[in-house]
Amino acid sequence: VDKLVETIALISKSFGGINLEDIAAPRCFEVERRLKEVCDIPVFHDDQHGTAIVVAAALLNAMRVTGKQMGQMKIVINGAGAAGIAIGKLLISMGFGNIVMCDINGIICEGDEGLNAGQEEISHISNRNHEHGALADALRGADAFVGVSRPNLVTAEMVSTMKDGIVFAMANPTPEIMPDEAKRGGAAVVGTGRSDFPNQINNVMVFPGIFKGALAVRAREITEGMKIRAARALAALVTDEQLSADYILPSALDKSVADTVAHAVAQEAREQG
């Protein structure tokens, strides 16, 4: 970690922003935190925040399809690594209801032993009903599932215990549950990380616009407000006429996506001063 931070910091003077990629948790949390402290340009770990923004946008539109209310939703996130923790923190910041984090050992609860720093931090602000148990227990009565974990962990029977479930199975190349299986279990909206299924949830929709907007106004950091504004702008690109259970996000190839996200980020930066 020390060498990585030192090297990036030394070359940072030559660049307008730093996009971190493929740094595993928990190292990524410390690397990003320390770089933000020593660099005067935006530092953005795409695997964390890019993924979180596009998931938030997808959830906003899945809510429009299902009629669910943000503050009343129970959202289960499986995979408490870089992406999962960032998704949980952003959704909590946006006002989504009860976020329940799960890892290989099941539901994460405040006071659990063996948590890394990122998991420990989110344990204090998630799982407000102090649930315990396995992933199947967490999904009972849940409104949404967000998977950033491993293939084939979720069954149709587990989905059937959800409430008009929103299922984002984003493990690649094989998702936590295949879309047809999730729908067989009664899922109302299904998304994956793959382009060969409807509703691809991919951070490629986010990071080009994030940096374009930040660089345009010479922002020194990517704030929580910018991330939220980007998620809302991305969601708003899908009109009421276009919106359906199989179309909750614009195509990653839509040329308007980057400019829309950039405009939202720049506007938020100006308003924040």
Where are these regions (language model features)?
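Adenosine-phosphate binding glycine-rich loop
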Residues: 46-47, 66, 171-272
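Electropositive phosphate-/nucleotide-binding environments in soluble metabolic enzymes
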Residues: 1-5, 25-29, 49, 53, ...
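Glycine/serine-rich phosphate-binding loop and adjoining beta1-alpha1 elements at the start
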Residues: 1-73, 262
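Short, ordered loop/turn segments at secondary-structure junctions
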Residues: 22-25, 46-49, 104-107, 150-151, ...
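Glycine-rich phosphate/diphosphate-binding loop of Rossmann-like nucleotide-binding domains
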Residues: 45, 49, 53-146, 150
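General beta-strand structural signal in soluble alpha/beta enzymes
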Residues: 19-22, 43-46, 77, 101, ...
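Rossmann-like adenosine-cofactor binding region
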Residues: 121-188, 194-196
